[in-house]
Curated annotation (Swiss-Prot):
Its main location: cytoplasm. The keyword Cytoplasm applies. It is found in: Cytoplasm. Has 3 domains, the large (RuvB-L) and small ATPase (RuvB-S) domains and the C-terminal head (RuvB-H) domain. The head domain binds DNA, while the ATPase domains jointly bind ATP, ADP or are empty depending on the state of the subunit in the translocation cycle. During a single DNA translocation step the structure of each domain remains the same, but their relative positions change. This is Holliday junction branch migration complex subunit RuvB. The keyword Electron transport does not apply. It catalyses: ATP + H2O = ADP + phosphate + H(+).
Amino acid sequence: MIEADRLISAGVISDEESIDRAIRPKLLAEYVGQPHVREQMEIFIQAAKQRGDALDHVLIFGPPGLGKTTLANIVANEMGVNLRTTSGPVLEKAGDLAAMLTNLEPHDVLFIDEIHRLSPVVEEILYPAMEDYQLDIMIGEGPAARSIKLDLPPFTLIGATTRAGSLTSPLRDRFGIVQRLEFYQVADLEHIVSRSAKCLGLELTPEGAHQLARRSRGTPRITNRLLRRVRDFAEVRADGAINGDVAMKALDMLNVDAEGFDFMDRKLLLAVIDKFMGGPVGLDNLAAAIGEERETIEDVLEPYLIQQGFIQRTPRGRIATNHAYKHFGITREE
């Protein structure tokens, strides 16, 4: 079982990119949720435009699926400049980054996703580029090698990461603007899914939007994915319109419950409750009990359950909370 196999995965599934681009907001006025981020970015962008400067470098971090790429696109659109996109793992050599930097136009935005995965060699190239708009290149080899400096046009680097703690201090300190994206409120997700339905030409009632939003784990990417799957159900089993009843039936069929849990979430929680009397249980024992690798539990399954208060990590192991017992209608034995 891997994260990409799950309907409620916050990661990108292979065929979603083109659809996501079509429904993605283009401007801050269309951007829903994250009010503190929206207000701050509106001020920073307006100030940069008034001065005729490039926007300061921006670091965006937070869980996957919350709109880091969307925000980078919006910044480029609001600034009226080009967006060049790449990712940390793709930039294997210093020359890969140098090629992108030397092709930038003044004030362009360079977006590096998964920036925490940059190699140290590539990261070193970024320091003078971000700070002084200069590129240090080594010419030649051995004793004859020499360094030359190339001037770069003023540009904005936007780095995105799900692991801000993995960034080195020198890189993190060079970002003048740092934005953390939080999980979305249900009301915001209702607005997002209603807008997406309109973009896709779907009939979605407010109650249908609510059912989709409340099961989306606070994540717009999951909301939009569930919308597409519920659309399929509505076209085959109903008249094509998505109301509350159709949405509930479709999501129940898809095995996504009222908390946004799928079968893997429930399997883990019930293992702690039934097999280990609510815990504490060590990670290795829990992994063996549900037939998963410990890394899958730690990196994929647990974070949302902990964030929502269904599981607690303690020095002695994992414990199911009263919230978890209540979810399954199980009375906790004292």
